[in-house]
């Protein structure tokens, strides 16, 4: 089963309705397992060229869009944790490695599609067939666990995104509401204002829960693309306004450390990996292209654009605000109506994007669950699982209300596995029997070791910071936590 973020356009979308009485979309997929591939034949996809599909430009836009979320707003704080020189350089290196690992995944998937005469292969299937191709008998016998491991990390990653979104929504809405009485029309000075205390940020998280429940009950991916389009527009406008502001009156950079303490670097690593975690969208995009032979070039171009945007936003944001930078750069904007509207636009965009991120774990878990019950219980079970999952993300966000640490934790735990650890190992298992140079094996081992070290150290550091903050401020709001 292909599981990914939406890459379809809104064409042909019907009126928005919950459609709770029809069978779940996942149930229909179980009844017709070949429906995913529409009318394509294996011979058509073997040539990597289709009569229908997205163009090169559309694939580029979708790839860039898949990397734009809350992660980019947290990168200035990440650079603070690494240093004004070390941070951008590390982002450049990590962007190159992440792009290389995406190329590895595409190369391995194309090899198995050609070898097995299949039209499409998702991340989990590619890893499973990679283990089957390995000469080790034990790995061959347990190859199906490769797909399960990928599915597990995809679930953790996407639900982690959802938790980050809830914390982001609460932090930004809380700041807007508290500053509403002192908001001015003067956008040229970022004066310190006395905020009017309101309810705890955790209550803001709960206030979003009914809207999130309604969104996740929309099970038609084509309808969700409407929300995707609205989210893209609102976030694009917000990013343009933010970049316009931070490029004004940049202070002297010499006051900032070139290299920060090594103790905070793991937090940078987790946040950076979180931002580059779009490897799950790569194979579905490649499959949807009219001519997939162009995809490697599109992947390189798209990730170059994304890396440049990340470095620019991260460096300029840290230069502009220095040690006062917060977990999301939107929280540093002046207290005028223009920049308050930026927060509201981003809130609307993230709220719409939540359903698309939620779609991925839902389409992994729900088909597995409803395949074990009768047809009459398929719909109630589908809706119940969605309700439990969205409540779980809200509960986790309430338990861990620090936006910067949630981002770093999600990136360290699951982002490193999907983006850095698994792809190099997959290349070894796929091509080892065909002969690989020692240099390639060394390169793959080095990347996987780097990912594993980042996984262990980044997770430990994020949890340690979280426990320290809870001990110091057990009942504080999340905005108080932001340094």
Swiss-Prot record:
Abundantly expressed in kidney and muscle. Expressed in the S1 segment of the proximal tubule close to the glomerulus. It is found in: Cell membrane; Endoplasmic reticulum membrane; Recycling endosome membrane. Residues 1-58, 103-148, 219-222, 286-296, 371-379, 426-437 are cytoplasmic. GO terms for biological process: amino acid transport; glycine transport; L-alanine transport; monoatomic ion transport; proline transmembrane transport; proline transport; proton transmembrane transport. It catalyses: glycine(in) + H(+)(in) = glycine(out) + H(+)(out); L-alanine(in) + H(+)(in) = L-alanine(out) + H(+)(out); D-alanine(in) + H(+)(in) = D-alanine(out) + H(+)(out); L-proline(out) + H(+)(out) = L-proline(in) + H(+)(in). It is linked to Hyperglycinuria: A condition characterized by excess of glycine in the urine. In some cases it is associated with renal colic and renal oxalate stones. Iminoglycinuria: A disorder of renal tubular reabsorption of glycine and imino acids (proline and hydroxyproline), marked by excessive levels of all three substances in the urine. It comes from the Eukaryota. Belongs to the amino acid/polyamine transporter 2 family. Electrogenic proton/amino acid symporter with a high selectivity for the small side chains amino acids glycine, alanine and proline, where both L- and D-enantiomers are transported. Extension of the backbone length, as in beta-alanine and 4-aminobutanoate or methylation of the amino group, as in sarcosine and N,N-dimethylglycine, are also tolerated but decrease transport efficiency. A free carboxyl group is preferred. The chain crosses the membrane at residues 59-79, 82-102, 149-169, 198-218, 223-243, 265-285, 297-317, 350-370, 380-400, 405-425, 438-458. This is Proton-coupled amino acid transporter 2. It comes from Homo sapiens. Keywords: Amino-acid transport, Cell membrane, Disease variant, Endoplasmic reticulum, Endosome, Membrane, Transmembrane, Transmembrane helix, Transport. Residues 26-36 have a biased composition (Basic and acidic residues). Residues 26-46 are annotated as: Disordered. PANTHER family: AMINO ACID TRANSPORTER (PTHR22950), PROTON-COUPLED AMINO ACID TRANSPORTER 2 (PTHR22950:SF185). GO terms for cellular component: endoplasmic reticulum membrane; extracellular exosome; plasma membrane; recycling endosome membrane; vacuolar membrane. One of its GO terms (molecular function) is amino acid transmembrane transporter activity. Residues 80-81, 170-197, 244-264, 318-349, 401-404, 459-483 are extracellular. The keyword Transport applies. InterPro entries: AA_transpt_TM (IPR013057). It is a multi-pass membrane protein. The keyword Flavoprotein does not apply.
């Amino acid at each position: 089963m292909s599981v990914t973020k939406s890459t379809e356009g809104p064409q042909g979308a019907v009126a928005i309705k919950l459609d709770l009485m029809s069978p779940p979309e996942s149930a229909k997929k179980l009844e017709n397992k070949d429906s995913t591939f529409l009318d394509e034949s294996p011979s058509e996809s073997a040539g990597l060229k289709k009569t229908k599909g997205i163009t090169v430009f559309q694939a580029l836009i979708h790839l860039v869009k898949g990397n734009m979320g809350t992660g980019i707003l947290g990168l200035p704080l990440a650079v603070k944790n690494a240093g004004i020189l070390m941070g951008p350089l590390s982002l450049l290196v990590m962007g190159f490695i992440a792009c290389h690992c995406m190329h590895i995944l595409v190369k391995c998937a194309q090899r198995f599609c050609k070898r097995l005469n299949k039209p499409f292969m998702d991340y989990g299937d590619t890893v499973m067939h990679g283990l089957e191709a390995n000469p080790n008998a034990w790995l061959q016998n347990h190859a199906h666990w490769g797909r399960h491991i990928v599915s597990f990390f995809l679930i953790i990653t996407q639900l982690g995104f959802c938790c980050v979104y809830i914390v982001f929504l609460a932090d930004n809405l809380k700041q807007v509401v508290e500053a509403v009485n002192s908001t001015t029309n003067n956008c040229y000075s970022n004066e310190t204002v006395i905020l009017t205390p309101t309810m705890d940020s955790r209550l803001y998280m709960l206030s979003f829960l009914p809207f999130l429940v309604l969104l996740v009950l929309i099970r038609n991916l084509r309808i969700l693309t409407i929300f995707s389009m609205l989210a893209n527009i609102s976030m694009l406008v917000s990013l343009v306004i933010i970049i316009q502001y931070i490029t004004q009156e940049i202070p002297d950079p010499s006051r900032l450390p070139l290299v920060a303490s090594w103790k905070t670097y793991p937090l940078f690593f987790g946040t950076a990996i979180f931002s580059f975690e779009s490897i799950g969208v790569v194979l579905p995009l490649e499959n949807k292209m009219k001519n997939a032979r162009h995809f490697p070039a599109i992947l390189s171009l798209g990730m170059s654009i994304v890396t440049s945007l990340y470095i620019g936003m991260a460096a300029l944001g840290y230069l502009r605000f220095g040690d006062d930078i917060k977990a999301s750069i939107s929280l540093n904007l002046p207290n005028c109506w223009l920049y308050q509207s930026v927060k509201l636009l981003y809130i609307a965009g993230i709220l719409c994007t939540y359903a698309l991120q939620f779609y991925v774990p839902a389409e992994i878990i729900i088909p597995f669950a409803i395949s074990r019950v009768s047809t009459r219980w398929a719909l109630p079970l589908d809706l119940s699982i969605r309700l439990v999952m969205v409540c779980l993300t809200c509960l986790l966000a309430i338990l861990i209300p620090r936006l910067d640490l949630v981002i770093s934790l999600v990136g360290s735990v699951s982002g490193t596995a999907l983006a850095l650890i698994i792809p190099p190992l997959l290349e070894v298992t796929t091509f080892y029997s065909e002969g690989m140079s020692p240099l390639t094996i060394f390169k793959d081992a080095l990347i996987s070791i780097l990912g594993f070290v980042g996984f262990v150290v980044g997770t430990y550091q994020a949890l340690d910071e979280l426990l320290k903050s809870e001990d110091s401020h057990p009942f504080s709001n999340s905005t108080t936590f932001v340094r």
